[in-house]
Design a protein with these regions (language model features):
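Non-catalytic alpha-helical coupling and interface elements of nucleotide-dependent molecular machines
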Residues: 102-105, 250, 304-308
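ABC transporter nucleotide-binding domains
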Residues: 3-6, 13-209, 213-214
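ABC transporter nucleotide-binding domain
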Residues: 174-266
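C-terminal coupling/interaction segments
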Residues: 266-321
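Short, surface-exposed acidic/glycine-rich loop or hinge patches that mediate macromolecular interfaces
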Residues: 68-69, 212, 235, 268-269, ...
Length: 321
């Protein structure tokens, strides 16, 4: 197994008596895409800021590349895209990229060459001489992403990278992140968009109210939460199946969409028994399939109770953004 690039060891951070991150431990192996997932205010940005040494933990330890200490000491090996985007609005796109690369120690000629290559790659080549404030929000976001990559970092940290992107640019970002992994980079990104996380993540950690709910390989998490879900399609009305759905010894939960239904089985229920009952009821089936739960469903099942408890709490993380 790859050695961890990032380790949080029982890290806690408090603001004004509120615990934003509560004893969080996680490890990000080298060469993977790791998702830090949670609802708004869960502690994702606070955790990333502790990794980057923007703020210090009140308790616990941050280790990067096997060394104790946070991102300031390893800044040359890290590319960081913060949630709050910030570029010099009156500078021209190419000039601002070259300037930011030079700040990271990249020689001017190399910075210009890399910036032009990245601009062409992300469809912004024709905009290189335009001022930043002439670009759309999505374009500016891509420019800021480029600025995180020009010094060729080993670890790329992206805080809500898909926020505000249209579907086309979100796909461009997804393809770029996948290519970074193929090149051996380690990517840590935070998001509350489960569809993107499911497509990208090798490993993930779900947090809520600053606490870890689950972490590990995506495949293992799905396996742990799977095996008790059915998708049933009907040729015609599902009315005949309603009595079967109501049997609490077989079915724990039903999402009935009319022409098909998603079932969560009771703990000791047998899918074959449900199939037999449905056939006996006269229901005409077009589909009967055991399925893995989506990451979105796992997220809702895990985070839902925590989110309900957090609803009345102030968003302290946002207040310290």
């Amino acid at each position: 197994m790859n050695s961890p690039v990032v380790v949080l060891d029982r890290v806690t951070k408090r603001f004004a008596g509120h615990t934003a991150v509560d004893g969080l431990s996680l490890a990000v192996p080298s060469g993977v895409i790791f998702g830090l997932l949670g609802p708004n205010g869960a502690g994702k940005t606070t955790s990333i800021r502790m990794i980057m040494d923007i703020i210090e933990p009140d308790e616990g330890e941050v280790r990067l590349f096997g060394e104790r200490g946070a991102g300031r000491d390893q800044s040359g090996r890290i590319g960081y895209l913060p949630e709050e985007r910030g570029l010099y609005p009156r500078m021209r796109v190419l000039d601002v990229l070259v300037f930011l690369a030079e700040v990271k120690g990249v020689p001017r000629r190399a910075a210009r060459t890399r910036a032009l290559e990245w601009l062409d790659r992300l469809g912004l080549g024709d905009w290189r001489q335009r001022r930043v404030n002439e670009l759309s929000k999505g374009m500016q976001q891509k420019v800021q992403f480029i600025s995180t990559m020009l010094h060729d970092p080993d670890l790329v940290i992206l805080d809500e990278p898909f926020s505000g992107l249209d579907p086309v640019n979100a796909q461009v970002m997804k393809d770029t992140v996948l290519d970074l992994r193929r090149r051996g980079k380690t990517i840590l990104f935070s998001t509350h968009i489960m569809e993107q996380a499911e497509k990208l993540c090798d490993e993930l950690c779900i947090i809520a109210r600053g606490r870890k709910l689950v972490d590990g390989a995506l495949s293992d998490i799905k396996r742990t939460h799977g095996g008790h879900h059915l998708v049933i399609g009907f040729d015609g009305s599902a009315g005949a199946a309603q009595q079967v759905f109501a049997e609490t010894g077989l079915v724990k939960k039903v999402d009935d969409y009319g022409q098909y239904a998603e079932l969560e089985l009771a703990p000791n229920a047998d899918a074959q028994q449900i199939l037999q009952r449905l056939v006996a009821s006269g229901a005409r089936l077009s589909r009967f399939e055991l399925m893995e739960p989506s990451l979105n469903k796992i997220f809702i099942d895990l985070v839902g109770p925590e989110a309900a408890r957090a609803a009345a709490q102030p968003d302290v993380e946002a207040a310290h953004a």
